[in-house]
Amino acid sequence: MANVVVIGAQWGDEGKGKITDLLSRSADVVVRYQGGVNAGHTIVVDGRVLKLHLIPSGILYPDTTCLIGSGTVVDPKVMLGELDMLISNGIDISGLQLASTAHITMPYHRLLDLAMEKQRGERKIGTTGRGIGPTYADKSQRSGIRVLDLLDEARLRDRLEGPLSEKNQLLETIYGEKPLDPEEIIREYLAYGKRLAPHVVDCTRAIHEAASDRKNILFEGAQGTLLDLDHGTYPYVTSSNPVSGGACIGAGVGPTLIDRVIGVAKAYTTRVGEGPFPTELSGSLNDQLCDRGGEFGTTTGRRRRCGWFDGVIGRYAVQVNGLDCLAITKLDVLDEMDKIQVSVAYELDGERIDYFPSCSEDFARCKPIFETLPGWQCSTAECRRLEDLPAPAMDYLRFLADLMDVPIAIVSLGASRDQTIVVEDPIHGPKRALLSA
């Protein structure tokens, strides 16, 4: 038995969906522990492209239980849309479970999210506009609506009365928006609750029962380390904790239940929205990475900012998450490059540093110090074993493993499941990896 956390080691969009999908074959339970529909992952199965935002990738395996944990925030309309999409594709959803204590994104959360971002003007933070921040804010202020509230009309009315009155006042007087009708909301969300009811469970009890039965549990994070509310590039962050420690809080387990932590990182770096990005490229190189990598957000459709691999934030992700091994994705995107650069340190105000500054203003002044490696200029998309890779590609992977001081367990070379080199099974294999410096 092994219980594994999968996290993003960059700014999200690292390809966690594919890696989680691969690992779900060996998992009995997959738990999404934080975030909401602001995240998105794309999975290609038998030529079908499936885009999910909230439901764990493990739903594609009929014998796998998929649990949306207490640390998530749930937009029931979007979730039910995903369920309908899966059903229309012939996918069994009977294994899906939803924590009764997960918080609900309400209509006023989305309206406030968009209104506040608009009001920030040039100081915008790049929100997806899905209401995630306001939902988590209400959770912290103890005025949120939870899944269990949608199952009881009297309780929903009681919980909604105060928050909705307050939000309507904000919408009208501050943002010039029309107030929301409480009866419409109650009817709509009770209907959502009725459809979701068969999937609602006690999250902590369900996970601990699985652990007692010695089942393999996979904890799936959304977004990435540098978007973590406490450890990321604040204020250009999400409103939850994608780091591995967030799995314990969002799923309701102690740290001793976690056996291994896997970090997922692209062979280069991307970022969506605002915020500092030291290795960001411009011009034709940026366009080449964006076009070859299909770098457009699953959730927003926004074009991602692209840059070279940043070993400084990579080492930081290793430390913050306690990574045991790495999955490197999209190596094939670099196939046509004649040379590849990797940031090994920064220059900050004339001084060389090898750490991630906690102040975003300092981080914005950091200039990358690069090492240049030769490209391989041939296709890796059909490689299925390490020995199939061209020598410069192997050298590049070893360089990353040495730079981050963590071994590589998985290499992804395309969107399809079979476009993968599994150096080591992170769930059933020994606690080691074969690809290191």
Curated annotation (Swiss-Prot):
This is Adenylosuccinate synthetase. Substrate binds at T298, T299, T300, G301, R302, R303, R304. GO terms for cellular component: cytoplasm. The lineage of its organism: Bacteria, Bacillati, Cyanobacteriota, Cyanophyceae, Synechococcales. It comes from Synechococcus sp. (strain CC9311). The active site is at D13, H41. Keywords: Cytoplasm, GTP-binding, Ligase, Magnesium, Metal-binding, Nucleotide-binding, Purine biosynthesis. GTP binds at residues 12-18, 40-42, 304, 330-332, 412-414. Its EC number is 6.3.4.4. The gene is purA. Pathway: Purine metabolism; AMP biosynthesis via de novo pathway; AMP from IMP: step 1/2.
